[in-house]
C-alpha cells in the first residue's frame, strides 16, 4: 500500500504542476526588429503552449500588456504604452473607474473618468489597477501610479525596455457575455 500511496502522490503532484502551469505560461521576450513604432514584444510561446489572443502578460506581478497575435511557436503582445492599448482600470484608494490608454511614450494616460475627480486627488499615492470590467483581465493587476505632477499621467510599474521574461496569464471570465477588444 506504500507503493500505492507513492503513486497517488506522484499523480497529485503532476496534477498540481499542470494546473499551476496552465494558469501561467513563462515566456522569454525575443528581440523584435519588426517595428520601432508599434510598442509590442515577441514572446517565445505560442499556440502549442496554449497561448491565446487576449491573454494578459505580466512582469512579476505587474501588467505589461496583452497577447494580440499567436502562431504555433511565438506570440506578440501589445504593451500598455502602445497608442492602441486601452484597458479598464480602477484608481485606488479612491475607487474611481477609468480607462488607461497608451501614449506611444514611456507613460500612460487616464481617460473616460466616470466623474470629475480633480478634487479627489488630494491623496499622494494613487495606484492604478485593472478593474476586470469587460472580462479582459482579472481585476487587481497593478498597472502603475498616478504621477505627482499630472493627475492624468500614469507611471507604469514595469520598465518595458528591460523585459526579459514575462508570464502569460489565462483568465477566463465567469460568464458568457463578455467581449474582447
PLM segments and residue spans:
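A secondary-structure micro-motif
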Residues: 4, 11-181
Amino acid at each position: 500500500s506504500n507503493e500505492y500511496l507513492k503513486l497517488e502522490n506522484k499523480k497529485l503532484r503532476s496534477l498540481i504542476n499542470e494546473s499551476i502551469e496552465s494558469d501561467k505560461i513563462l515566456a522569454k521576450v525575443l528581440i523584435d526588429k519588426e517595428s520601432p513604432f508599434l510598442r509590442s514584444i515577441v514572446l517565445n510561446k505560442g499556440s502549442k503552449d496554449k497561448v491565446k489572443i487576449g491573454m494578459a502578460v505580466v512582469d512579476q506581478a505587474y501588467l505589461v500588456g496583452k497577447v494580440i497575435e499567436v502562431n504555433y511557436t511565438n506570440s506578440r503582445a501589445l504593451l500598455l504604452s502602445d497608442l492602441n492599448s486601452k484597458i479598464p482600470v480602477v484608481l485606488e484608494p479612491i475607487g474611481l473607474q477609468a480607462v488607461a490608454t497608451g501614449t506611444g511614450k514611456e507613460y500612460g494616460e487616464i481617460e473616460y473618468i466616470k466623474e470629475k475627480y480633480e478634487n479627489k486627488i488630494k491623496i499622494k499615492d494613487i495606484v492604478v489597477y485593472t478593474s476586470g470590467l469587460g472580462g479582459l483581465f482579472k481585476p487587481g493587476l497593478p498597472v502603475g501610479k498616478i504621477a505627482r505632477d499630472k493627475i492624468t499621467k500614469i507611471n507604469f510599474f514595469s520598465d518595458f525596455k528591460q523585459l526579459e521574461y514575462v508570464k502569460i496569464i489565462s483568465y477566463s471570465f465567469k460568464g458568457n457575455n463578455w467581449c474582447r477588444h
